[in-house]
């Protein structure tokens, strides 16, 4: 670059920094880039691997959508539990007014340390979310759900009144404000969304999500969660078989998927995933009905091995670490905002 151009650029950069503050513009020479993307585990080992970076990326917007009773809130609460386990501070904006503290505690959430808001209107919910993010003191915010973010005009109006596009405009405006603050404060914001059917669709999927298109564009990760079957013991139903597809991913290759079990009253069966993925990666050996690790038998039948891993969390953590290292998705936790932990999974 010529001297004249260099001087002109230096003057422009100085003017920008004077007007908008230091760091408003920077050269990507590597010194300003973070070596590793910071993530928060989803609580599902398989999904962490499918995401390609070991969890949900911080400083980004994530959308989780699916049919009713598919495990959307359960997945979010599992992620909240993982964030708290590593010293993170979490907030739950419950627009549906359906938060169950007893169930959350069973999933490992420290309910007494969770900030809960049950707003009256969509505007109030999103303003609370923005204020929490701008504070810089929150690591993760969950909004449950976009469909329940009802605009004030609709609440104050009469039944049957037409309010076309109100919610979509509300979401679009809020996300324009939120995005910059989320990146600056390195906060993870998760929006839970519901599925609706488009009328008159002849070709392609008739399914769509609520709240317009803004969330689809602003989200760095979009997860489609579905219940694929039931887990039974005789006639008793113990849980759901669940599949999550990574529909959009700006931080790793998309279109991967993960399958795991959600057990009623326990949440995601982490030990079950360890067994399945451990066998697939040749970390756990399976011979007939017997499973062995490091040459020692650990149980006959998957259910017995799951119980053994629960009783031996240090071995379970060791297998988890080996699987993550083998797949190149070791998690990177922010220093300073999160306390050191012993690495144990919350009790279920």
Curated annotation (Swiss-Prot):
**Which keywords fit this entry according to its UniProt record?**
ATP-binding, Cytoplasm, DNA damage, DNA recombination, DNA repair, DNA-binding, Nucleotide-binding, SOS response
Alphabetical list of InterPro entries matching this protein: AAA+_ATPase (IPR003593), DNA_recomb/repair_RecA (IPR013765), DNA_recomb/repair_RecA_CS (IPR020584), P-loop_NTPase (IPR027417), RecA-like_C (IPR049261), RecA-like_N (IPR049428), RecA_ATP-bd (IPR020588), RecA_C_sf (IPR023400)
Gene Ontology CC terms, in alphabetical order: cytosol
* Pfam families, sorted: RecA, RecA_C
Q: What does the UniProt entry say about where the protein is found? A: Cytoplasm
A single Gene Ontology molecular function, please? ATP-dependent DNA damage sensor activity
Q: Where does ATP bind?
A: 66-73
Asked whether the UniProt record includes ATP-binding among its keywords, one would answer yes
Principal place of residence: cytoplasm
Q: Which GO terms describe its biological process?
A: DNA recombination; DNA repair; SOS response
Disulphide bond pairs:
none
Annotated SMART domains: AAA
Task: State the function annotated in the UniProt record.
Answer: Can catalyze the hydrolysis of ATP in the presence of single-stranded DNA, the ATP-dependent uptake of single-stranded DNA by duplex DNA, and the ATP-dependent hybridization of homologous single-stranded DNAs. It interacts with LexA causing its activation and leading to its autocatalytic cleavage.
Query: Per the similarity annotation, which family is this?
Result: Belongs to the RecA family.
Query: What is this protein identified as?
Result: Protein RecA
Source organism of the structure: Neisseria meningitidis serogroup A / serotype 4A (strain DSM 15465 / Z2491)
């Amino acid at each position: 670059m010529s001297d004249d151009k260099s001087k002109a650029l230096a003057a422009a950069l100085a003017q920008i920094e004077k007007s908008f503050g230091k760091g408003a513009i920077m050269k990507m020479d590597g010194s300003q880039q973070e070596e590793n993307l910071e993530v928060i585990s989803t609580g599902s080992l398989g999904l962490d691997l499918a995401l390609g970076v070991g969890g949900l990326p911080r400083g980004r917007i994530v959308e989780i959508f699916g049919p009713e009773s598919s495990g959307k809130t359960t997945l979010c609460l599992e992620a909240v539990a993982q964030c708290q386990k590593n010293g993170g501070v979490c907030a739950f904006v419950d627009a549906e007014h359906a938060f169950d503290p007893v169930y959350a505690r069973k999933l490992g959430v420290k309910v007494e340390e969770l900030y809960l808001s049950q707003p009256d209107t969509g505007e109030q919910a999103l303003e609370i979310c923005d204020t929490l993010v701008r504070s810089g003191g929150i690591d993760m915010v969950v909004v449950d759900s976009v469909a329940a973010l009802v605009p004030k005009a609709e609440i104050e109006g009469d039944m049957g009144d037409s309010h076309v596009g109100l919610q979509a405009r509300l979401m679009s405006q809020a996300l324009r404000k939120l995005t910059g603050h989320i990146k600056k404060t390195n906060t993870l914001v998760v929006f839970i969304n519901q599925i609706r059917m488009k009328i008159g669709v002849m070709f392609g999927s008739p399914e769509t999500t609520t709240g317009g298109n803004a969330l689809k564009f602003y989200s760095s990760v979009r997860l489609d969660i579905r219940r694929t079957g039931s887990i039974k013991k005789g006639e008793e139903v113990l849980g759901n078989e669940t599949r999550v597809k990574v529909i959009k991913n700006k931080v790793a290759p998309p279109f991967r998927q993960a399958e795991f079990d959600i057990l009623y009253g326990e949440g995601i069966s982490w030990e079950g995933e360890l067994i399945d993925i451990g066998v697939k990666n040749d970390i756990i050996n399976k011979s007939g009905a017997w499973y062995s690790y490091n040459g020692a038998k650990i149980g006959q039948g998957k259910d017995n091995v799951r119980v053994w891993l629960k009783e031996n969390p240090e071995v379970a953590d060791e297998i988890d670490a080996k699987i993550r290292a083998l797949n190149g998705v070791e998690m990177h936790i922010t220093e300073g905002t999160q306390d050191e932990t012993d690495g144990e999974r919350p009790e279920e």
